[in-house]
């Protein structure tokens, strides 16, 4: 199902996106969540492309760090942890047509936009059909009620805004 689709514009001079993984942000009782990050133009390093800590299990190094939406302490603690543990960071430009798919446990960041051009990206997030909203969404979950109008915590995450985008087990056709 579609959780949301966002156009993300990082304006010229806009600062970096702090380290995080999306499981904090989506109030879903599943880890079967993926985001497609689709650049609308080539993104050079100076524009602040998406960067990842690898491997995906890196989140285990930082899952005990308390998330703080209002300060840089969380970001600083993750950065320090990654340095201490020699975590590999993949930070590369995106050519037009390249898409990043990342799991909700993938630790990621994005650099500052040091150009005079807006960095524009479409980010679509999908989750497994049959998923429930967590019992206690947090402030970090943001405007989750906008994405699930009429639903309350603990209910099945299914509204007209969350269509099934593809069905499990159905034949999928790949076009090259």
At which residue positions do the language-model features occur?
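Short, surface-exposed loop/helix-turn segments at secondary-structure junctions
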Residues: 21, 73-87, 118, 137-143
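Conserved double-stranded beta-helix
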Residues: 1-50
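Feature marks short, surface-exposed loop/turn motifs that line or immediately flank catalytic pockets
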Residues: 11, 44, 59, 128-130
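Double-stranded beta-helix
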Residues: 43-109
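A short beta-loop-beta micro-motif enriched in histidine and acidic residues
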Residues: 22-33, 87-88, 94-96, 117-118
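Short, solvent-exposed aromatic-acidic interface loops
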Residues: 8, 55-58, 142-145
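Non-heme Fe(II)/2-oxoglutarate
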Residues: 65-67, 99-101, 105-176
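Short, function-defining helix-loop hinge/capping sites that tune catalysis or transport
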Residues: 28-30, 62, 111-113
């Amino acid at each position: 199902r579609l959780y949301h689709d966002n156009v993300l514009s990082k304006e010229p001079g806009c600062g970096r996106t702090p380290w995080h993984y999306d499981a904090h942000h989506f109030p879903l009782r599943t880890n079967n969540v993926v985001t497609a990050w689709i650049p609308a133009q080539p993104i050079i390093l100076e524009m602040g492309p998406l960067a990842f800590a690898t491997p995906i299990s890196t989140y285990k190094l930082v899952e005990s760090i308390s998330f703080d939406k209002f300060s840089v302490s969380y970001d600083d603690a993750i950065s320090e942890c990654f340095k201490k543990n020699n975590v590999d960071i993949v930070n590369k430009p995106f050519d037009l047509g390249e898409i990043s798919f990342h799991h909700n446990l993938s630790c990621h960041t994005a650099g500052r936009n040091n150009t005079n051009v807006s960095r524009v990206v479409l980010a679509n997030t999908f989750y497994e059909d049959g998923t429930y909203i967590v019992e206690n969404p947090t402030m970090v979950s943001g405007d989750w009620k906008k994405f699930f109008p009429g639903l309350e915590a603990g209910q099945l995450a299914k509204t007209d805004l969350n269509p099934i985008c593809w069905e499990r087990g159905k034949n999928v056709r790949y076009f090259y």
